[in-house]
Amino acid sequence: MDIKLWTRAYYQDLLERSENKRKKDLLELLADEKKYAPCFEGLDQLTESVFKRIFSKKYLGNTKTFEQEMQSHVISTAKKFCPDVEKEMDDTTVLQQLWIEEYAQELSLKGKLHFCLKEENGSTQEINTECYRFGTTLNSQTLEHAEIKEVQNIQKIVIFENKANYISAPYKDGILYLFSHGYFSPKECRFLKQLHQVLKNQTSCEVQYFHSGDLDYGGIKIFQYIRKTIFPELEPLQMDVETYEAYQEFTEVIDPETLEKLKRVQDENPKLQELIKRLIETGKGIEQECFLIEKRGNHI
């Protein structure tokens, strides 16, 4: 989205709050907010990712000012006003949605994917990840400059929330595995949206999309986010009552506050409704890594 939209909403809210304040309180509010102005102005100007300390030096005059004085306020504000940010995202993921990086954005994948990279001399290098049978990682620059080929041999995309499950997935022809590490970063999202469009244009076969994550509130929210922002055809994999019952001995207690959140999202997720109902009934969830202890229930 256009970052200016959410910062504009933030300042509009600030104006509305200031209208009903006494002069003394208003001056205190404006004094508190004034120090954040250069930071939000910098966020407003970003058109591509920048490392956190470089952003801080450029717009705030010191490499550590953002992290020490601005970061917590920016994150809480973004969670309130930025539609690309989910309340459940950790700090690093929120900053990535705002184009501020603590480290490079990378996409880990396993399977056959064809794309091209343009060299500095203008020539094009074709790449097929099929040879990396145990998986490979595309760095930030590759995600930015890769051009996905129009012809792909992908029948199924399977996303894993956790790395151990991604690594353990066996290479199979026609399946592209992705590791989401929670929420995909903006560069990963943009790359995967391009891939989705290419696959939609294919007439040879209809691609299936699956996501496998933790059987808890966080896993459900991640599934919902990926389905909303990247792959609208996404289906849950190993995120059902059958899988839950198969691994019930590995359940962990869900805190009361999170249980209340689960109740609020039950109607938002028809594909996960039965699982959510079971989580609420038992008050317990299961982490995806437990599926690797012993194969039970539904597996790839």
Feature names for model-found ranges:
Residues 158, 176-179, 208-210, 234-238:
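Short hydrophobic alpha-helical runs that function as membrane-insertion/retention elements
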Residues 206-216:
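Acidic beta-strand-to-loop metal/phosphate-binding motif
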